[in-house]
Structure formats: structure tokens, C-alpha cells
Amino acid sequence: MSEIPGDLKFLKSHEWARVEGNGRVTVGISDHAQGLLGDLVYVELPEVGATAKANEQIAVVESVKAASDVYSPVSGTIVEVNSALSDKPETINEDAYGDGWMYVVELSNAEELNELLDPDAYAEALEDEDH
């Protein structure tokens, strides 16, 4: 398993959130999730201006093996999407925590960040999942 960046927070369903400090949060799926899915062939992103709700489905990733819903770690308004993923969904496989980000949300409730797992808790959840 790859290194889990220390600046991220996670949902147990393998989505990550990076607080950008300007009231915005960048979201993607974890390296563990992309590894389980295998080669991604399609990504359905939310539209800019759409409303994300914490723990609700906001996007879809499809691999040669399966389709998987992506849940938003936080609530707010979508202000940017990584449209490059439309042509190169495999970017998530190659760089899940970097160029493979999915969207940016303008946070509506910063308290929701406290509900997310820190990297250590996420790593523990992965270990529990493997047993």
C-alpha cells in the first residue's frame, strides 16, 4: 500500500479531502480505492455549481472490473472539477492524491471536517478491512 499523505482526511468509503485553507476542500479517491478498482476507464464528475452533501453520492468511477459511487466527504458548492479526468481517467490510478483529484467544494459546514478520519485512523480502518 502506498504512503497516506498526512494532510488528508478520509471517509471510510475511501474518499479523501484536502483542506486548502481558503474555505475550499479538494476531493478524490484514495490510492487504496483505485487499487481495488483496477484500471479506471470512466469518471463521471459533478457539475460546477452543484451542491454536495456530506456522505451522499456525488460522482462515479468505472473500471474494467466495476462501477463505484463516490461520496462527498463534506457539504458545499462544487466550484471546480478536474475535467482532464474525462479524457484520462487513469490519472487517478497513476496519482490518486495529486493530479487524480476529482473536484473542489466551497465548504458550507467546516464542522464536518471533524467527522472525517485522520490518516492514522484511515490506515487502521484499512487494516481492519483486510482482516
Curated annotation (Swiss-Prot):
- What SUPFAM superfamilies does the entry give? Single hybrid motif
Q: Could you tell me which residues carry N6-lipoyllysine?
A: 65
Keywords recorded for this protein, A-Z: Lipoyl
Give a single Pfam family match: GCV_H
rRNA-binding found in the keyword field: no
Family membership noted in the UniProt record: Belongs to the GcvH family.
Q: What does the UniProt record say this protein does?
A: The glycine cleavage system catalyzes the degradation of glycine. The H protein shuttles the methylamine group of glycine from the P protein to the T protein.
Database matches in PANTHER family = GLYCINE CLEAVAGE SYSTEM H PROTEIN, GLYCINE CLEAVAGE SYSTEM H PROTEIN-RELATED
Q: What is this protein called?
A: Glycine cleavage system H protein
Which species does this protein come from?
Stenotrophomonas maltophilia (strain R551-3)
Q: What is the lineage of its organism?
A: Bacteria, Pseudomonadati, Pseudomonadota, Gammaproteobacteria, Lysobacterales
Q: Which gene encodes it?
A: gcvH
